């Protein structure tokens, strides 16, 4: 009897020892991964379909750009919902609505064939639903792990980042093969099944209703005003950290997402094969950063945040130098790729420090709203970075743009150090 008792209680002890080995967290991660995989698989299929039908790569890019504004405006409503209702219910409803949206559009395409307007509406709706789900997931993590401290929160964020990176890389690898083999419509079927499966999985997550805090707030506007007062009056250092993260997103989006492909393809003149290999390495480095972050999560306290930003700035310097001095194309490609991989690792570690600090710096009834406002700020910075760097690379030499980027990243260190001392 003693041996049997020990065998049955050992899993409970190991589960208690590691809060991440819980059924609810595993279901949350599974639902998130399936939903993200379905979303990105659909985006890839639609981009290929639009390109085949219109011959214009800019058409689908314009659709994605048009979805940014409603996403920024409506994302805070997701934060309000996350703090007002059961977060499990919100996640299930949003994934179910995503499945219904794709199903309706698939029926339209089956009856009428290719329709660019329907694709545009579908992508805008899905972008808004995804932006509303993100703060819900980010608010669910503190609800699960707040009592275990920031170390566990950082480990949980690392797991979520690994899932995000994997779910981003897999559709990029499989998307082309599937589209060539079966076409867009069967891939829409895969997406519908994916969203539906995510909703079913999330139904089994056990999450209670969040603490409403001040029940006097009766409208979404009241909730957002309360979040604004909280950030500006009660916890201004949290607001400053949100703004720093938005500034980082501006730099990384501009120099990595815009500058890296421009320098490899246009400045250095490499073909799609070399760029695809380099892009794959950069994507894998983000996954590596999340894995490393999970291993060293206990040491990633806020006092390490300035070191992460300093490491990020140092990854830009070799690129500025190699694009300024005389060097061969292969050497420049190697330095650009290796340094951008370093950038992705440094930024991933910085996110693992900053995001849990923001989450843990908010009370239960503010987490969703604050995270949604942080998401909106980052989304505002993203197109600004794309536009600014697109203009800069077309006017100035790549080495000069990178040198200015290095200077801006270095200039962030004093305010970063100041904010760090407040946590």
For the regions a protein language model found, what residue spans apply to each?
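C-terminal transmembrane bundle of multi-pass solute transporters/carriers
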Residues: 5, 73, 77, 84, ...
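Primarily residues marking transmembrane-helix entry/exit sites
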Residues: 21-29, 116, 120, 234-242, ...
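Substrate-agnostic recognition of the 12-TM MFS/MFS-like secondary transporter fold
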Residues: 27-43, 67-80, 86-98, 118-180, ...
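A single, central transmembrane helix in multi-pass transporters
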Residues: 33, 44-45, 182-189, 229-290
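Hydrophobic alpha-helical transmembrane segments
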Residues: 116-123, 127, 152-213, 280, ...
């Amino acid at each position: 009897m003693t041996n049997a008792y020990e065998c049955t209680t050992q899993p409970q002890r190991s589960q208690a020892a590691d809060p991440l080995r819980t059924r609810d967290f595993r279901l949350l991660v599974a639902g998130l991964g399936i939903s993200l995989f379905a979303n990105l698989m659909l985006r890839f299929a639609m981009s290929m379909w639009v390109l085949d039908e219109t011959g214009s790569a800019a058409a689908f890019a314009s659709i994605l750009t048009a979805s940014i504004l409603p996403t920024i405006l409506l994302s805070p409503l997701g934060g309000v919902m996350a703090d007002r209702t059961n977060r499990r219910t919100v996640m299930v409803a949003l994934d179910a609505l995503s499945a219904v949206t794709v199903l309706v559009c698939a029926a339209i395409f089956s009856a009428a064939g290719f329709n660019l307007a329907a694709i545009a509406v579908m992508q805008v709706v899905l972008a808004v639903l995804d932006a509303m789900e993100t703060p819900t997931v980010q608010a669910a993590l503190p609800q699960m792990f707040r009592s275990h401290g920031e170390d566990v929160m950082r480990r949980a964020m690392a797991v979520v980042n690994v899932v995000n990176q994997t779910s981003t890389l897999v559709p990029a690898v499989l998307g082309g093969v599937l589209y060539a083999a079966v076409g867009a419509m069967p891939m829409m079927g895969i997406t519908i099944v994916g969203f539906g499966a995510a909703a079913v999985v999330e139904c089994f997550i056990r999450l209670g209703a969040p603490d409403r805090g001040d029940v006097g707030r009766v409208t979404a506007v009241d909730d957002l005003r309360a979040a604004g007062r909280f950030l500006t009056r009660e916890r201004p250092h949290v607001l400053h950290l949100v703004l720093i993260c938005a500034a980082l997103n501006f730099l990384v989006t501009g120099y990595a997402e815009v500058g890296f492909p421009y320098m490899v393809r246009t400045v250095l003149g490499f073909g799609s094969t070399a760029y695809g290999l380099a892009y794959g390495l950069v994507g894998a480095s983000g996954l590596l950063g999340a894995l490393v972050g999970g291993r060293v999560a206990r040491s990633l306290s806020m006092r390490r945040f300035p070191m992460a930003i300093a490491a990020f700035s140092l990854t830009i310097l070799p690129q500025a130098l190699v694009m300024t001095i005389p060097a061969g194309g292969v050497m420049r490609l190697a330095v650009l790729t290796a340094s951008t991989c370093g950038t992705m690792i440094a930024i991933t570690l910085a996110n693992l420090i900053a995001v849990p600090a923001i989450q843990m710096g908010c009370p239960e009834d503010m987490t969703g709203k604050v995270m949604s406002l942080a998401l909106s700020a980052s989304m505002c910075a993203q197109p600004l970075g794309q536009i600014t760097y697109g203009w800069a690379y077309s006017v100035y030499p790549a080495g000069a743009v990178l040198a200015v980027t290095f200077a801006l990243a270095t200039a962030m260190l004093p305010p970063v150090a100041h904010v760090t001392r407040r946590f």
